[in-house]
Amino acid sequence: MGGDIQQKVADISDVIFKMDTDRLTERICGELKYAANRLEAVRLPDAPPASRRAAALDEIERAGRETEQMISLLSSELTEIYKADAAYSCLRGVLEDCSKRLSYLSAQLGSGEDKSSVTLRHISDLRMSVTVAHRYITMADGRREYLRFLVSGINSVLVNTVPLWRGALISASENPGRENMSRLGTLKEAMTTAVRDILLEASK
């Protein structure tokens, strides 16, 4: 009675345990760090003289390429995070259902007249499976919370910083004067700082 549900709890708990969220986040952080370093390495002059205009435009173009690679990377990582979050959500739902059914079976057995050692042991096993289910539900929730933090940080960069950066990039490409170059440099720093903030929080 309830053996198939208990087995499902064991199987799903094992799947959750083996889902390597750490490896996923380590890969994401490694790629973001590399992208941030490349963007940071771009040297944007404040106001290039006419003789340096072509070189400045080359640097602006390079900054644009590095940023687009970073944006593509951020978007790609979001997709991977959403997949992991959906998997945890699905597994958590199954565990929650199993927990309710096992609790119901345990209560049924406990209210019966049969108080033999076999029945009592069975009740104990059912309750243990409920405990295991709740433990892994908590684990799944914790990992989902961490993934949501990454999503929030990445979305903030994509939604708040990237549009400003692209606008500044166009302005600087059309007119690499002091004001436009200064704004571009400020936004480049804001972009790399935002990504490094994500990395810093992710490492805690």
Model-derived segments and spans:
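Leu/Val/Ala/Ile-rich N-terminal alpha-helices, chiefly Sec-type signal peptides and the beginnings
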Residues: 1-92, 99
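Long amphipathic all-alpha helical oligomerization modules
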Residues: 103-204
